[in-house]
């Protein structure tokens, strides 16, 4: 399955400002988002399931892959395209056994060692970061910058997306590294015009 990682949206309901998540995701896709990750922290399993199911109605309609952050059970329950796992989440090999070979598994990495390990273990793509300082993640160990991104990108052969503080003023510098895509939260969700915000992050619009 060929996946377009160019513009990777991660959901965060804290940025909704009273708007419906389904509508926000739809507008983002219409603006150019190519893949959506549903990320929910500190909510019940039932609530996460309901949110993910709601988003999947939109992604299915537009034939855009939907990735679930961390929770394999939710991914299975809604038949998501795959999961995204952090360094402290379930091991990739176990996740692959559970989900099977046809599902997408992405791994967050912050250095060359983690990247090579994830690639060797069969990750489908990597989320590389944190590139720039960001308010979305509080447990950031290290900002790697463009140089750190380039080093990791040059060490691997699988697709990757950059994450962390990427916005319309710096995304072109990130893409110059040859990375397959950028992953954003607030650069789209914190804007009033979601569709325009997404479109402003496309290199070939």
Swiss-Prot record:
Entries under InterPro entries matching the protein: Aldolase_TIM, ThiamineP_synth_sf, ThiamineP_synth_TenI, TMP_synthase
Residues annotated to bind Mg(2+): 70, 89
Enzyme Commission number, as recorded: 2.5.1.3
Pathway membership, UniProt: Cofactor biosynthesis; thiamine diphosphate biosynthesis; thiamine phosphate from 4-amino-2-methyl-5-diphosphomethylpyrimidine and 4-methyl-5-(2-phosphoethyl)-thiazole: step 1/1
A Pfam family: TMP-TENI
One cellular component (GO) term of this entry: cytoplasm
Name used for this protein in its record: Thiamine-phosphate synthase
GO biological process, alphabetically ordered: thiamine biosynthetic process; thiamine diphosphate biosynthetic process
Residues that coordinate or bind 4-amino-2-methyl-5-(diphosphooxymethyl)pyrimidine: 37-41, 69, 108, 137
GO MF assignments: magnesium ion binding; thiamine-phosphate diphosphorylase activity
Top-level EC class as recorded in UniProt: transferase
Residues reported in the UniProt entry to bind 2-[(2R,5Z)-2-carboxy-4-methylthiazol-5(2H)-ylidene]ethyl phosphate: 134-136, 165, 185-186
Cofactors that this protein relies on: Mg(2+)
UniProt catalytic activity: 2-[(2R,5Z)-2-carboxy-4-methylthiazol-5(2H)-ylidene]ethyl phosphate + 4-amino-2-methyl-5-(diphosphooxymethyl)pyrimidine + 2 H(+) = thiamine phosphate + CO2 + diphosphate; 2-(2-carboxy-4-methylthiazol-5-yl)ethyl phosphate + 4-amino-2-methyl-5-(diphosphooxymethyl)pyrimidine + 2 H(+) = thiamine phosphate + CO2 + diphosphate; 4-methyl-5-(2-phosphooxyethyl)-thiazole + 4-amino-2-methyl-5-(diphosphooxymethyl)pyrimidine + H(+) = thiamine phosphate + diphosphate
Co-factor note (free text): Binds 1 Mg(2+) ion per subunit.
Domain of life, source organism: Bacteria
Known function: Condenses 4-methyl-5-(beta-hydroxyethyl)thiazole monophosphate (THZ-P) and 2-methyl-4-amino-5-hydroxymethyl pyrimidine pyrophosphate (HMP-PP) to form thiamine monophosphate (TMP).
Annotated TM spans: none
Keywords in alphabetical order: Magnesium, Metal-binding, Thiamine biosynthesis, Transferase
């Amino acid at each position: 399955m060929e996946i377009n990682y160019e513009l990777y949206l991660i959901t965060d309901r804290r940025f909704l400002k009273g708007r419906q998540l389904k509508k926000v995701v739809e507008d983002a896709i219409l603006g150019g988002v190519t893949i959506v990750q549903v990320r929910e922290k500190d909510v019940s399993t039932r609530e996460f399931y309901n949110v993910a199911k709601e988003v999947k109605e939109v992604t299915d309609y537009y034939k855009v892959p939907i990735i679930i952050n961390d929770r394999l059970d939710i991914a299975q329950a809604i038949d998501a395209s795959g999961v995204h796992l952090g360094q402290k989440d379930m091991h990739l090999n176990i996740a692959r056994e559970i989900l099977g070979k046809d599902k997408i598994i992405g791994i967050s990495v912050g250095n060359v060692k983690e990247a090579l390990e994830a690639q060797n273990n069969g990750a489908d793509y990597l989320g590389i970061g944190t590139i720039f300082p960001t308010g979305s993640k509080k447990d950031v160990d290290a900002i790697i910058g463009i140089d750190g991104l380039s080093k990791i990108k040059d060490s691997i052969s699988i697709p990757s997306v950059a994450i962390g503080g990427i916005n319309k003023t710096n995304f072109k510098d990130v893409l110059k590294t040859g990375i397959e895509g950028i992953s954003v939260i607030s650069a789209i969700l914190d804007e009033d015009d979601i569709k325009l915000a997404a479109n402003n992050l496309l290199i070939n619009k």
